[in-house]
Amino acid sequence: MRNVWLIVPFALLAALSGETWAQADRDLYIDSTESSGNYPVDDDDYSSGSGSGIPARGDDEDENVVLTTVQTLISSPSSEMPYVETTTLKTQTKMAPETKEPGEVESTNTVLVYGKKDIVQTATHTENLFHRTEVLAAVIAGGGIGFLFAVFLILLLVYRMRKKDEGSYDLGERKPSSAVYQKAPTKEFYA
């Protein structure tokens, strides 16, 4: 029975590692369709597939892409009305620059559709940077650490000032010469 418990983890490890190697082999040759080396003579016309993924256009119009998520919410769960989430892509050209306060982020438009009633609600709101809990927690933690550091620095300065008053530091006073101290005669007694 003990041997079975030792063999099962090794077999499981071998099975999982073999699966990841097979997955790595599939990912190795992603761009195999264009690997023949037969490119056009004019290299400027050829797109290598690397870069941002935005195709180059002849016109210089500024286009902004707005991503809108449409969610169909069902009032009661049933098999007749499945949950559907679709994403539509809209393009807008030459938007005027908006002035925003620093630290504010605008959220995306969301459209909610409920069942067959087709009630459409759109919501746009701005979010201040300090309303996010992780930013607020980081600011509070940084303030606490800074406060502790300041208290430690003040305590260190007070400690050094007290030690200086006690006389344990060399304050630049002259020490008496070694001639002032006389060596006591040493007498040796042998028994």
UniProtKB/Swiss-Prot annotation:
Pfam families: Syndecan (PF01034). One of its GO terms (cellular component) is membrane. It is found in: Membrane. Its main location: membrane. Keywords: Glycoprotein, Heparan sulfate, Membrane, Proteoglycan, Signal, Transmembrane, Transmembrane helix. InterPro entries: Neurexin-like (IPR003585), Syndecan (IPR001050), Syndecan/Neurexin_dom (IPR027789), Syndecan_CS (IPR030479). The keyword Lyase does not apply. Residues 32-60, 168-191 are annotated as: Disordered. Residues 1-22 form the signal peptide. Residues 159-191 are cytoplasmic. O-glycosylated; contains both heparan sulfate and chondroitin sulfate. The keyword Ribosomal protein does not apply. Belongs to the syndecan proteoglycan family. Cell surface proteoglycan. This is Syndecan-2-A. It comes from Xenopus laevis (African clawed frog).
